[in-house]
UniProtKB/Swiss-Prot annotation:
This is Stress-70 protein, mitochondrial. The modification Phosphoserine is found at residue 408. NCBIfam families: PRK00290.1, prok_dnaK. The modification N6-malonyllysine is found at residue 206. The keyword Zinc-finger does not apply. It comes from Canis lupus familiaris. GO terms for cellular component: cytoplasm; mitochondrial matrix; mitochondrion; nucleolus. The modification Phosphothreonine is found at residue 87. Interacts strongly with the intermediate form of FXN and weakly with its mature form. Interacts with HSCB. Associates with the mitochondrial contact site and cristae organizing system (MICOS) complex, composed of at least MICOS10/MIC10, CHCHD3/MIC19, CHCHD6/MIC25, APOOL/MIC27, IMMT/MIC60, APOO/MIC23/MIC26 and QIL1/MIC13. This complex was also known under the names MINOS or MitOS complex. The MICOS complex associates with mitochondrial outer membrane proteins SAMM50, MTX1, MTX2 and DNAJC11, mitochondrial inner membrane protein TMEM11 and with HSPA9. The lineage of its organism: Eukaryota, Metazoa, Chordata, Craniata, Vertebrata.
Amino acid sequence: MISASRAAAARLVGAAASRGPTAARHKDGWNGLSHEAFRIVSRRDYASEAIKGAVVGIDLGTTNSCVAVMEGKQAKVLENAEGARTTPSVVAFTSDGERLVGMPAKRQAVTNPNNTFYATKRLIGRRYDDPEVQKDIKNVPFKIVRASNGDAWVEAHGKLYSPSQIGAFVLMKMKETAENYLGHTAKNAVITVPAYFNDSQRQATKDAGQISGLNVLRVINEPTAAALAYGLDKSEDKIIAVYDLGGGTFDISILEIQKGVFEVKSTNGDTFLGGEDFDQALLRHIVKEFKRETGVDLTKDNMALQRVREAAEKAKCELSSSVQTDINLPYLTMDASGPKHLNMKLTRAQFEGIVTDLIRRTIAPCQKAMQDAEVSKSDIGEVILVGGMTRMPKVQQTVQDLFGRAPSKAVNPDEAVAIGAAIQGGVLAGDVTDVLLLDVTPLSLGIETLGGVFTNLSTETPLFQPRKVFSTAADGQTQVEIKVCQGEREMAGDNKLLGQFTLIGIPQPLVESLRLKLPFDIDANGIVHVSAKDKGTGREQQIVIQSSGGLSKDDIENMVKNAEKYAEEDRRKKVTTFSVNMAEGIIHDTETKMEEFKDQLPAEEVNFQNEGTLARKDSETGENIRQAASSLQQASLKLFEWHTKRYVG
């Protein structure tokens, strides 16, 4: 927690103060810190003493995920089992109960759209009634349902899964990738989240890590991680902007780098703006044009829509390097007149016109971030692009117009975040030194006060009059309900309710003059801790804000068990597959040799071996297949030894 580490931070930042005034600048404000000064601190002095083994850095993305580890002083991005450096954040469940993750899941999405989940990061930590969730329900082929706790979950084959569970399945794939490379178990991880994620979304991401079997040491902001990847080996002091337009979210962060000190000056963004929206906009355009030309409405055909969705994503990517592309989908659907084919040419200019409003939505957050950081575009020495959508030329031009300089391409937009997470893991393990990370909270924190007003704890006076005071008739005591919210709206009801707690034991005569001191801390994961203390009586109560409407401890434990069950099933499947491959190789070699020497082998032995071979091809378990293959191999060796002695020896 920051409160527990301020002394250590002061020592570190004090040393940095000689390097420049802004590296250690804290604005005067309540409790000595302003909203912008709630810091997340990390350096060797703050490294955990208990960390043993490698710490993997994971970018759990909306569209794709990536994992990296530190090798000495350099971060290395790891390839998955399919040989790719990024893994689609897609999870599917087949009709026979098999779970697929990554590219195997994405490949079968056309034939199984209702049970293939993608972009579920947009649902993580969200309530079913959220406007963004209601919008998503209309755009995806799979079912989004209301869970018993009011959260948005997904459904496949009658079973419900939380977005944290789906994220956990992807994290398990990342964990497996790391373990295959390291050669041993990977337990500790740093996971990234969008900078504009609220407390519930951060908690839900940590839940996903726990379900996957990872010990999540830290949750850090994606733009901050990208800045670490960019600036670790840079000696020049400068202010940079990180423009992060990924698959599902948009973040903009302004940072100052001074001799190893990475200070986030401000952050802003939109947690429901990304490549998925670009795909959806193009999909709507294609469906509209197809209906105009053929009279057929594709919106009721999930399989056809999935084909169009994949074609839209492919066309979007191609138009980043080409000025025109063709979209060809034969036999897309059919009506009474026969099959219908989709053939369409799409130019870059047409696509830019379709998504221009989405690109413009990134401008206001950038302007607000510069305003909050108290910098102008002339102060910014470098603009870093992160996220696959920043490959789009129109996005790059918008960034150049906005900041007055061509954006840098010094980092890989798909890998920078995972690299930064691995660097942060190295910091926590004590392997990376001379790095100090100072981050900010993305949204204001406060409480509900009289009239339902949202009172910002970081900018207002620390003494508040609570909205509700309850009296108990039995003993004349009172209890005070305190609601903690997060957001930027003026009324508490319009912001996110993080949690509530009660301060009890306040004498009745003091109610009218009751004033509470409400200090709060934000730990290194951006998770909120609040306490309330009555100035008159000294009564105090504390709360660690848990995900409002999120997963309970029992929920998480059950999901961990389910994840372990899937892991065991995956292990058995891997053993069976290996055994089948081995057996098929032995069968092929044996049959080839027996065919070659059948005239020189006893007929009854040839028939016996053939019968055994055919029978054992149908063995179901890996162990049975292995034993059958071994028996066949031994019998064949004896037979060919006999042949060698008789005809060769």
